[in-house]
Swiss-Prot record:
Biological classification of the source: Eukaryota, Metazoa, Chordata, Craniata, Vertebrata
Glycosylation sites: 3
UniProt topology in membrane: Multi-pass membrane protein
SUPFAM superfamilies the UniProt entry points to: Family A G protein-coupled receptor-like
GO MF, one example: G protein-coupled receptor activity
Disulfide cysteine pairs (residue numbers): 95-187
Organism: Homo sapiens (Human)
Task performed by this protein: Odorant receptor.
Extracellular side: 1-23, 74-97, 159-195, 258-270
InterPro entries reported for this sequence: GPCR_Rhodpsn, GPCR_Rhodpsn_7TM, Olfact_rcpt, Olfactory_GPCR
Name of the protein in its database record: Olfactory receptor 12D3
Keywords, in A-Z order: Cell membrane, Disulfide bond, G-protein coupled receptor, Glycoprotein, Membrane, Olfaction, Receptor, Sensory transduction, Transducer, Transmembrane, Transmembrane helix
Length: 316
């Protein structure tokens, strides 16, 4: 008979057990986290302070930046601490808390990306009614719906995982506390947990992905057949390409991790995918959305001072 116990704490194995590599990983992830804070923080400040960015598109972009900062902050600070500390234990309550916020913020981002695609669809395909359809009340309602749906989705996973019985090893083969590696340590029946993880997570992520895909294809088709302006077509294609790149970087690793069959699961692959959607994608989002965006670059010049840019241009 299995020794069923109530776990008071878990032990993270982390990214690697090789001591010599840990300072290297610490430096890499510290740089990634700082770039994330600076990049997304700058966008958030610009959206709040610059009146010309007070539009639905930038309202959602500000939400995305806030999410990216919070999403990475759920996992990366703990990872950095674990890379420099010998003790990597966390209480069971701390484990469930991290799990909850990771899924809460991650699923909010998945839904928000679909909302952003819908916003671009309305702006390009129905520009005359854009301000009527995407009025401030609708924008707030859509954003609030994304946050609320995701909160209860994450709460479902947290409650169901908290009610599992754990036995044997306390060692978690991951660098943060997620549902899948925790289910491997459970000695009670996890069939319902696994089913919900695949079906519900799949419905949220793949549903949002296909809505985004549909919006992008409809926009491209609309412009090709209804619009003869090369300038407008180029601008719209650039916007769709940027958003589609972000979508693929986020949904691809999420789908690979949570939707594929349990028999095909590899913890090494899961860790690589988790690094992609929890650390790398939040860093790339500001670059993808703002590098070719003239409005954002102009707002950046206004906020951080024209003189700084003039001095930089003179020296280069």
């Amino acid at each position: 008979m299995e020794n069923v116990t109530t776990m008071n704490e878990f032990l993270l194995l982390g990214l690697t057990g090789v001591q010599e590599l840990q300072p290297f990983f610490f430096g890499i992830f510290l740089i990634i986290y700082l770039i994330n804070l600076i990049g997304n923080g700058s966008i958030l400040v610009m959206v709040v302070l610059e009146p010309q960015l007070h539009s639905p598109m930038y309202f959602f972009l500000g939400n995305l930046s806030c999410l990216d900062i919070s999403y990475s902050s759920v996992t990366l600070p703990k990872l950095l601490v674990n890379l420099v500390c010998s003790r990597r234990a966390i209480s069971f309550l701390g484990c469930i808390t991290q799990l909850h916020f990771f899924h809460f913020l991650g699923s909010t981002e998945a839904i928000l990306l679909a909302i952003m695609a819908f916003d671009r669809f309305v702006a390009i395909c129905n520009p005359l009614r854009y301000t009527v359809i995407m009025n401030p009340q609708v924008c707030i309602l859509l954003a609030a719906a994304a946050w609320l749906i995701s909160f209860f989705y994450a709460l479902m996973h947290s409650v169901m995982t908290a009610h599992l019985s754990f036995c044997g090893s306390q060692k978690l083969n991951h660098f943060f506390y997620d549902v899948k590696p925790l289910l491997e340590l459970a000695c009670s029946d996890t069939l319902l947990n696994q089913w919900l993880l695949s079906i519900v997570t799949g419905s949220i992520s793949m549903g949002a992905f296909f809505l985004t895909l549909l919006s992008c294809f409809y926009v491209i088709g609309f412009l090709l057949f209804k619009n003869r302006s090369c300038r407008i077509l180029h601008k719209a294609l650039s916007t769709c390409a940027s958003h589609f790149m972000v979508v693929c970087l986020f949904y691809g690793p999420v789908g690979f991790t949570y939707i594929r069959p349990a028999s095909a699961t590899s913890m090494i692959q899961d860790r690589i995918m988790a690094i992609m959607y929890s650390a790398v994608t939040p860093v790339l989002n500001p670059l993808i959305y703002t590098l070719r965006n003239k409005e954002v670059m102009m707002a950046l010049k206004k906020i951080f001072g024209r003189k700084l840019f003039k001095d930089w241009q003179q020296h280069h």
